[in-house]
Amino acid sequence: MLVLANTMHAGERTQTPQLFRKMSRAIRLMAGMQLLPAEFARVLNPPRRTQAPIVFYLGCNALRTPHLLFNAMYVLDALGTDYEVVGGPGSCCGIVQSKWEGELGRGERMINATLTRFEGLSPEKVLSWCPSCNLHIGETLAGFHSTSFEFGHFTTYLADHLDELRLKFVRPLPLKAVLHAHVGLADLGRNVARVLAAIPGLQLVDTVAESGYTCGGSGCARAPELMKKEHAQLIDRVRETGAGVLVTFYHNCHAAFVRAENEGGLRVLNYTDLLVEALGAAPHEDVFKRLRLIDDWKMIVDEAEPYLRANGIEFDRPLLEKILPDVFRMAEFTGGLDCFASRT
């Protein structure tokens, strides 16, 4: 019902015209700044297999912080999961068209195409990463669209396989941590807390649940003053407990907090980083955090340029330096990034 209400409001007067086009280009740019060509192809190209018992559905915006997704794939591999990856704007769940642009027909066509792509792999389960996709597709399947597969969240799959996962944790992590979660979709936050509690040596001293179901434009950023207050309270709580680690949940949450490391006294890690470490491996490099901690847009372009060229992404350097602040803060969700709106 919430999505329907937002759709009706957006249909009357959208403040985010051409959002999907702008978002798609921003996502491709950000993924291209951080990934090697083989990785870039894996998360953006259509699946190569014709059948897979499990589909790991990335959604769109998670590709802005792609190291989380590759960490998640490492965990699936460690569990021996036979899966295929589907993601990127070409497999959008349709929430942007419906909820943000008010284009219900386009949103329906998009979600139907994505569900058809899932069905083409004949999966038993589809595991979603993105909370917005989880909500939108979940609501679509609840009485409106029948499928042959079970749709659920990646963290639920981890919780269901926790006994197996626990046996594979070979590296103790002597850390004190506070988990950042949300009031909305609280069961998913509890899944993460359960899995983290199984890591040897890790002391989860608190879970702080903020308003909304995620950080970012679809979540708590819609109330900026409340978001600012709750984010500050979370950082204070990490310091009060003496925890050295703030554990983030979703991609937007991770993006919102990584710069807190510049203040000193804490590390910002995603829960998937900790899982990979506990499994005895090195997490995928968090290039997003490395770039944000530089906090100099010319230097960020210097760092990103080899990745962009390797991935075949053409760019105008002065323009890129100018727009990167808006790209990183997802300004298209507040009507910005008009340079990405043209059809060419």
Model-inferred region functions:
Residues 146-173, 207-217, 262-300:
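Short, flexible loop segments at boundaries between secondary-structure elements
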Residues 124-130, 177, 244-249:
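Short glycine-rich phosphate-binding loop at a beta-alpha junction
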Residues 86-88, 163-168, 174-226, 310-314, ...:
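Redox- and metal-dependent alpha/beta enzyme cores, enriched for Fe-S-associated oxidoreductases
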Residues 226-244, 253:
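A short, acidic, amphipathic alpha-helical segment used as a generic capping/interface helix at domain edges
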